Amino acid sequence: MSPLSVQNLTAHYGATQALFDVSLEVAQGEVVALMGRNGMGKSTTVKSICRMIPAGGTITFDGNDLRALPAHKAAQAGIGLVPEGRRCFPNLSVRENLIAAARPGPWHEATVLDLFPGLRDRLDQSAATLSGGEQQMLAIGRALMTNPRLLILDEATEGLAPLIRQAIWDVIARLKQDTGLGILLIDKSLKELSAIADTAVILDRGTRVWGGTIAELTPEVTNRHLGL
């Protein structure tokens, strides 16, 4: 059984249905790309998995029913989330941001700083003084400090300068190589996703319209479903 199994996921915003029986799985050590045009349900899927919005269907992680969790408590189940948009506490220092997210396990301040050495000299500075790229690195560091078994990255490279974007892709590649984390990625960078992901799922208007290995993600598929 895959650590994360999502079956027949549905979600609504008021009277409007946003997801229609979406299914996907993420195995331990696997990188899965969740793809689709803007507004097709990718972030809604992530929010549903992480108990940020109500959802129907079945969501299990390590055999446990995530829908039984209190809202916004995905970290307790072992899921680390970097949501769309950079998320940190601007009124806290970098170190305080990391400490606030900490849960027992191998990821701690030193291991996060090994991954993001550029934050080492900024530990005692307010997170509000960081650049956008540094804030995103801090957001990923905070997610890792929860010591997850599954890491979800929702548009983690969106709006960043090319060098910072590449640095984050390098970090994701390192996490894939050196850890047993399952990783669920949402990103528009087809080239980078194709280089790092094992499998992909494509959503269109809240419905899963394609799923397969990265090798099967042909130009015909991307043109039909992504307009690329």
Predicted segments with their positions:
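Glycine-rich phosphate-binding loops of nucleotide-dependent enzymes
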Residues: 2-228
